[in-house]
């Protein structure tokens, strides 16, 4: 069993973290640049034979996505399950988690993972039945974060939120109708930030399991932000508070 990853950042991140997963690497024939060449040399240093391919073949493998001239066939990475949560929580003193409810676009999933990694989030939690897959597109957008941030798929998100609360983790949901903003909220302790789908927001049951609802103040003419942008705004307000 194998999967495809593509893009310089995604391939480089896997090489740095889990090089034994590589099976085959394909590079665009005739392409040489200052970012790709060192990566090729690094792959060759672990014994990988680089296979050359034309652009049409690479485009077909990635269904027309921007592959930056490199794709790799790799062994699947570790799949985190909900029963991994207790061990993960036991390893950190002040858990900082991100929960995505209904984010179905792999570009948004990848962007949220990238922001989560930059913000120091310990894990991202998503439901099995209402979420984008961590496919090659999401990994490319994540720019390596898919290899560093545990992505935990859960069967029942409401049950998982209850579990987090049993571990004294404050569950903070985002909703436009919240009576206070994230800048008025205390985001310094053990917490899980819950982001809903763009437009629809969190599902009713998810919302009911939040300890607190916050909003992002909007002063312009648009009514909402892209979910990955909103996630970044909220995460880095938490980072600001937690580092002050």
Swiss-Prot record:
Q: What is its EC number?
A: 2.1.1.185
A molecular function (GO) held by this record is:
RNA binding
Q: Which residues cross the membrane?
A: none
Q: Matching Pfam families, A to Z? A: SpoU_methylase (PF00588), SpoU_sub_bind (PF08032)
Q: Quote the catalytic activity from the record.
A: guanosine(2251) in 23S rRNA + S-adenosyl-L-methionine = 2'-O-methylguanosine(2251) in 23S rRNA + S-adenosyl-L-homocysteine + H(+)
EC primary class: transferase
Free-text function comment from the UniProt entry: Specifically methylates the ribose of guanosine 2251 in 23S rRNA.
Instruction: Output the CDD domains linked to this UniProt entry.
Output: SpoU-like_RlmB
Protein name per its UniProtKB record:
23S rRNA (guanosine-2'-O-)-methyltransferase RlmB
Q: Which UniProt keywords apply?
A: Cytoplasm, Methyltransferase, rRNA processing, S-adenosyl-L-methionine, Transferase
* PANTHER family reported in the protein's UniProt record: 23S RRNA (GUANOSINE-2'-O-)-METHYLTRANSFERASE RLMB
Q: Which family does it belong to?
A: Belongs to the class IV-like SAM-binding methyltransferase superfamily. RNA methyltransferase TrmH family. RlmB subfamily.
How is this protein organized at the quaternary level?
A: Homodimer.
The residues that hold S-adenosyl-L-methionine are: 196, 216, 225
Localization: Cytoplasm
Where mainly located? cytoplasm
Where is it found, in Gene Ontology cellular component terms?
Answer: cytosol
HAMAP family from the xrefs? Answer: 23SrRNA_methyltr_B
């Amino acid at each position: 069993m194998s999967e495809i990853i593509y893009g310089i950042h995604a391939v480089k991140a896997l090489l740095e973290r889990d090089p034994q997963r590589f099976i085959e690497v394909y590079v665009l024939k005739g392409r040489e640049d200052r970012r790709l060449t060192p990566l090729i040399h690094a792959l060759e240093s672990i014994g990988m034979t680089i296979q050359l391919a034309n652009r049409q073949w690479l485009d077909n493998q990635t269904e027309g996505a921007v592959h930056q001239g490199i794709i790799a066939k790799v062994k699947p990475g570790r799949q985190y399950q909900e029963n991994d949560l207790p061990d993960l929580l036991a390893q950190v003193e002040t858990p900082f988690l991100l929960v995505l409810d209904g984010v179905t676009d792999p570009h948004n999933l990848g962007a949220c993972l990238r922001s989560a990694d930059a913000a120091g989030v310990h894990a991202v939690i998503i439901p099995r039945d209402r979420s984008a897959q961590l496919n090659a597109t999401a990994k490319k957008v994540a720019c390596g974060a898919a290899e560093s941030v545990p992505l935990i798929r859960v069967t029942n998100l409401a049950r998982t939120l209850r579990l987090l609360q049993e571990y004294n983790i404050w569950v903070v949901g985002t909703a436009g109708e919240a009576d206070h903003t994230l800048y008025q909220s205390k985001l310094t302790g053990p917490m899980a930030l819950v982001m809903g789908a763009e437009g629809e927001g969190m599902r009713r049951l998810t919302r009911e399991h939040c300890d607190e609802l916050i909003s992002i103040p909007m002063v312009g003419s648009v009514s909402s932000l892209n979910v990955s942008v909103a996630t970044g705004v909220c995460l880095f307000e938490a980072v600001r508070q937690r580092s002050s």
